[in-house]
UniProtKB/Swiss-Prot annotation:
Transmembrane segments: none annotated. The keyword Hydrolase applies. Its EC number is 3.2.2.-. GO terms for molecular function: alkylbase DNA N-glycosylase activity; DNA binding. One of its GO terms (biological process) is base-excision repair. It holds the Pfam family Pur_DNA_glyco. It is an enzyme of class 3 (hydrolase). The lineage of its organism: Bacteria, Pseudomonadati, Pseudomonadota, Gammaproteobacteria, Lysobacterales. The keyword Signal does not apply. Belongs to the DNA glycosylase MPG family. Keywords: DNA damage, DNA repair, Hydrolase. CDD domains: AAG. HAMAP family: 3MGH (MF_00527). It comes from Xanthomonas campestris pv. campestris (strain 8004). This is Putative 3-methyladenine DNA glycosylase.
Length: 207
């Protein structure tokens, strides 16, 4: 039996736009002691989202996105980096990309994985945080909810922001107008500052 307390599967069993802001301030944990507080996320929403890998339906690459919520979807970006996503259950093909973390523990291991990266850039960006946590293709499909896998996400008692800042997603060419990126207000650990947009604050329900 696991002594860990991962978020339960029910937490992920909703629309990615609901789950994404609720993941802010939760903690990504590795079994070797690496820990980072989630500061930036993006929602990807299946067949209604042209920027989602799952937009055109299930493929061998995206099969995990159409399975049970609470699993890890890992993919290669820019031919050089891995990125990690939590699969959601509100509709087929929904997932939340974890874009940035604030390092909390295991920083020596993160530095070893990332080389001479400055502390503030250890985990600010999807590729950087995946490298800092040693994530690769072998982690695709990992169940985040069991507490016995090498990675999980937990609640350490820090509440999600009541009014997270929302804005357009980064590094996509389609559906660029959708404000489905959320960040912790005032965090110094973001992949990129959030531009000021009308209605930039969003409720934690995703409405």
């Amino acid at each position: 039996m696991s002594l860990h307390s991962p978020l339960p599967r029910a937490f992920y069993a909703a629309d990615a736009r609901t789950v994404a802001p609720l993941l802010l301030n939760k903690v990504l944990v590795s079994a070797d002691g690496r820990r980072g507080r989630i500061t930036e996320v993006e929602a990807y929403c299946g067949s209604e989202d042209a920027a989602a890998h799952s937009f055109r339906g299930m493929t061998p690459r995206t099969q995990v996105m159409f399975g049970a919520p609470g699993h890890l979807y890992v993919y290669f970006i820019y031919g050089m980096h891995w990125a990690i996503n939590a699969v959601c259950g509100g509709a087929p093909g929904h997932a939340v990309l974890i874009r940035a973390l604030e390092p909390l523990a295991g920083c020596d291991a993160m530095h070893a994985a990332r080389g001479a990266a400055p502390f503030k850039s250890l985990t600010t960006g999807p590729g950087r945080l995946a490298q800092a946590f040693g994530v690769s293709a072998v982690d695709n499909g990992l169940d985040l909810t069991t507490g016995v896998a090498r990675l999980w996400i937990e609640d350490d008692g820090t509440p999600s922001p009541a009014a997270p800042l929302a804005g357009p997603r980064i590094g996509i060419r389609k559906a660029v107008e959708l404000p489905w990126r959320w960040v912790v207000p005032g965090s110094a650990y973001l992949s990129r500052p959030l531009p000021r947009v009308s209605g930039a604050r969003a409720s934690v329900t995703g409405d």
